[in-house]
């Protein structure tokens, strides 16, 4: 006989947080939103990979490309580059994110002394970089002979065939730093000598890295930015359960910090096989999340299969119609509460803490705080990020209002059959997502800052200044339908102006 749940499943909108005691220290400026991204053992100080803010962007064509990944990493979160594209294109997006943040940056713009000004212009157009290293063999491993920047030539006054050796700044006139120079030392040299870039060279004169002034300035503007050990922006990437043997190595080679199996339903042998392949080939060196699941059994299955984090949620996304088309899913709040309990049980039994990601169901900013209070370590958002300048879709004018295009990975437009495949050879038989618009909201930075200030303020109302204490001490109440109505404006006539809901 089928199993019947005795209680209905609930959404975030059916809950509220009850205030706790607010001490003098409970102010937004004192709140830390740092949170684990991947699993760790009891006794470790923290997770091998952590987020500075509990927000990650969804594995979607209309959300997570390299531009949004850089913008989110600057704020302290991470993007998962969408996998519904060729292996080569996804790896290239990852590589662009890793090369964007310049702590110690390997040079990807190199020419030999015999190259011409036209070669410089072509390379600049291809890479977007204006600093070109001139090396003995034209590669990043060659002996550094000089540097060309846009100040060394004038297109309107020079023959495109002019050799770079005639207008480059030669090595003997360059200010360089030796191998082993720290980032602080490099930045001090840049400031003392008023440089835009500083080459780091080996004892035998080979170019190792560049350090750029612009990255120091960006760091000052973005103190929470999420960086790896080489001071590069961190980025994740989505994979599927079909071509993982080819895709995973390419993404690892490109520098992806973490992977995530992208599927509408993760309690399957296909995810187990994908996790097994990664563990057998890479051990624990490659971090990979799995999902999505909505109950204790699903979490346990993926945790035991080796997942570094588990995503929770089926059918709760704004463009997802899995519940409508297949009758599969669960209210996001109920799913999250059960999986969080399973996560804590697993930790008590094994000493291994497997973070959980709440994916879907976020409509208002306060839902973020509720999700964290209910046990989520971080939150995956699609529609939220799709509204911003940095998302990859077009901004269009619809009925006098600016909108951004937004479509689901289960839609016919995405044609991402790998995400919804059950192991057969057929393609997309029916859609589990829609093609739509979302209201344009402007730049990511100011919107994320506004949302997170609300989260921090609510945490202070609950009497806590970090996420673990919120999960431990929050008081959450289920509310009636009339309580929900009472919580909004009522019995007044609004003046005609825009509202701030997203």
Cite the ranges covered by each PLM segment.
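Active-site-adjacent beta->alpha loops and helix N-cap segments on the catalytic face
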Residues: 85-95, 141, 156-161, 206-226, ...
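Short beta-strand/loop segments at the ligand-binding rim of alpha/beta enzyme cores
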Residues: 48-57, 103-108, 228-237, 278-294, ...
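Surface-exposed amphipathic alpha-helices with a cationic face
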Residues: 44-48, 73, 98, 121-125, ...
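Glycine-rich phosphate-binding active-site loops on the catalytic face of alpha/beta enzymes
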Residues: 74-89, 256-268, 308-326, 362-395
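Alpha/beta catalytic cores of nucleotide-metabolism and tRNA/nucleoside-modifying enzymes
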Residues: 1-21, 109-112, 177-178, 184-188, ...
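Catalytic cores of alpha/beta
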Residues: 67-70, 244-254, 288, 294-312, ...
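Catalytic beta/alpha-barrel core
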Residues: 80-85, 109-111, 131-135, 176-178, ...
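Bateman/CBS regulatory modules and CBS-like beta-alpha motifs in cytosolic regions of diverse proteins
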Residues: 27-51, 58-60, 89-129, 134-137, ...
């Amino acid at each position: 006989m089928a199993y019947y749940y005795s209680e209905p499943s609930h959404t975030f909108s059916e809950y509220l947080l009850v205030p706790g005691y607010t001490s003098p220290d409970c102010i937004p400026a004192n709140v830390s939103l740092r949170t684990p991204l991947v699993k760790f053992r009891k006794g470790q100080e923290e997770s091998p990979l952590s987020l500075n803010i509990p927000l990650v962007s969804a594995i979607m064509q209309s959300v997570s490309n390299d531009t949004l990944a850089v913008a989110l990493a600057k704020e302290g979160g991470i993007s998962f580059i969408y996998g519904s594209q060729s292996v080569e294109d996804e790896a290239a997006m990852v590589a662009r994110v890793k090369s964007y943040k310049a702590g110690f940056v390997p040079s990807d713009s190199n020419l030999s002394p015999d190259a011409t000004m036209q070669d410089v212009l072509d390379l600049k157009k291809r890479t977007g970089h204006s600093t070109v290293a001139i090396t003995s063999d034209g590669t990043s491993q060659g002996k550094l002979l000089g540097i060309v920047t846009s100040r060394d030539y004038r297109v309107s006054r020079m023959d495109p065939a002019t050799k770079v050796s005639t207008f480059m700044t030669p090595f003997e006139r360059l200010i360089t730093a030796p191998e082993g120079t720290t980032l602080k030392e490099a930045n001090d040299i840049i400031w003392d000598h008023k440089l835009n870039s500083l080459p780091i060279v080996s004892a035998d004169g080979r170019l190792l890295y560049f350090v750029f002034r612009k990255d120091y300035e960006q760091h000052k503007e973005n103190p929470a930015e999420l960086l790896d050990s080489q001071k590069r922006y961190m980025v994740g990437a989505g994979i599927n359960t079909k071509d993982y043997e080819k895709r995973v190595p390419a993404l690892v080679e490109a520098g992806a910090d973490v992977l995530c199996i992208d599927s509408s339903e993760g309690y399957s042998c296909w995810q187990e096989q994908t996790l097994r392949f990664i563990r057998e080939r890479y051990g624990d060196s490659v971090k990979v999340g799995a999902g999505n699941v909505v109950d204790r059994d699903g979490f346990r299955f993926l945790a035991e299969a080796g997942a570094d984090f588990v995503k929770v949620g089926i059918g709760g996304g704004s463009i997802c119609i899995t519940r409508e088309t297949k009758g599969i899913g669960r209210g996001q709040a109920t799913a999250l509460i059960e999986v969080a309990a399973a996560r804590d049980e697993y930790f008590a039994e094994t000493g291994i803490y497997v973070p959980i990601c709440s994916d879907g169901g976020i409509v208002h900013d306060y839902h973020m705080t509720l999700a964290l209070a209910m046990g989520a370590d971080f939150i995956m958002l699609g529609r939220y990020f799709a509204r911003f300048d940095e998302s990859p879709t077009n901004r269009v004018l619809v009925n006098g209002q600016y909108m951004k295009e937004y479509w689901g990975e289960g839609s016919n437009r995405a044609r991402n059959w790998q995400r919804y495949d059950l192991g057969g050879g057929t393609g997309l038989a029916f859609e589990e997502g829609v093609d739509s618009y979302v209201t344009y909201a402007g730049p990511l930075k100011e919107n994320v800052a506004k949302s997170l200030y609300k989260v921090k303020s609510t945490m202070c109302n609950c009497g806590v200044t970090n996420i673990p204490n919120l999960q431990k001490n929050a008081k959450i109440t289920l509310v009636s339908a009339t309580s929900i109505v009472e919580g909004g404006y009522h019995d007044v006539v609004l003046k005609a102006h825009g509202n701030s809901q997203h």
